[in-house]
Amino acid sequence: LTDRTMAVAEMALWDLAGRMLNIPVWKLLGGYREKVPAYGSTMCGDEMAGGLATPADYGNFAEWMVNRGYKAIKLHTWMPPVSWAPSVKMDIKACAAVREAVGADFPLMLDANHWYSRVDALELGKGIQDLGYYWYEEPMDEHSTESYRWLAENLDIPIIGPEYAYGKFHTRAEWIAS
């Protein structure tokens, strides 16, 4: 089955449930909200003047987002084709610069762009955990739930799995079960 076929079936089932219960689907899904929390997000780092070329640039950009009213920030650090990326040490420096810029209680998250091995992902995770980051997203180029489970067992920070899980709905079911 394709994702499209599954989506059509899922929508039909939600519609059927709503009709059987005489409740609109939007209520079955939890109603609506007057406000939705949003967080600021950085682009991936680069090597261009005026971009996100240094940890200080990340700190300055974080201050800029705070001044515009964002209540949380998710960072995306450097990745190829940046000549020296990926680098655990540089990522930790950027994360530390942002933490210093926004203060100890400001919610921060890191999306590591799936560039790290298990060992490097653990080192980076410990670094941002010590900086009080809220979550750690997609640190490994890994689609195994076991690798992510191992990482989660070795850190005290929530781990977000990969955005792209190959294998369609069968793989997603494995992630949900984990």
What do these predicted ranges mean?
Residues 124-136, 177-178:
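Structural recognition of alpha->loop->beta junctions
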Residues 143-148, 152-178:
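Catalytic alpha/beta core domains of metabolic enzymes, predominantly
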Residues 74-76, 109, 113, 132-143, ...:
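Catalytic beta/alpha-barrel core
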